[in-house]
Amino acid sequence: VIPGNITFDNRYNAVKLNPTNFGIDISVYLEKFIGKTITGKISNISATVEKIALPTTDPVDDITIYVKYINSGDDFSSSVFTDGEALIGSAASLGDGVFFIRGYFVKVTQQTIILDYYSNNPSYRVGLQVTESFIGSKDDDSLFDNAKGFTNFAAPGADRLKITLTLTKKLLTDLEDTDFVEILRIDNGKVKKIKSKTRYNQI
């Protein structure tokens, strides 16, 4: 209904980091850098940190940050960090929106998924993974009966259906779509299909 725009970034700049700084494991505080601006010590190039990949949770050998460069540095010719720090990955991003899924209007928040960590020629189907769950009064106090103007913990109300939409990727050969809504298809780094139009007559 209010579709979040889907975008494909085939220049998702990656920077590998040393795992420690002055003997401290940087993964302990690395999450705090998301959204912050960092500057190369030698190149003086600045970039905004967008995403982080860790060997413990992602298919990478080294701690890697993904950045958007802001300037070209002191010499006005360099556009990426120096000293072999720079690599190129690929990603897909979805903006805030509302989708009509299984008879319900479901809100989706801005999400970014890394397609290939160190390659910009990915081949994937990108879309929304649909997950259904039930939320009861044990999970949300507001579901207790409040007919008298206050929460009555002795009278739990009805459970609620929760639908969660998560941006995910699937191989081109994976055609199992029971809980998947495709919105973007990429083959060898080329966009082959993109779903961007809202079809109100189907609602």
Predicted segments with their positions:
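Subunit-assembly interface segments of extracellular/virion macromolecular structures
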Residues: 1-203
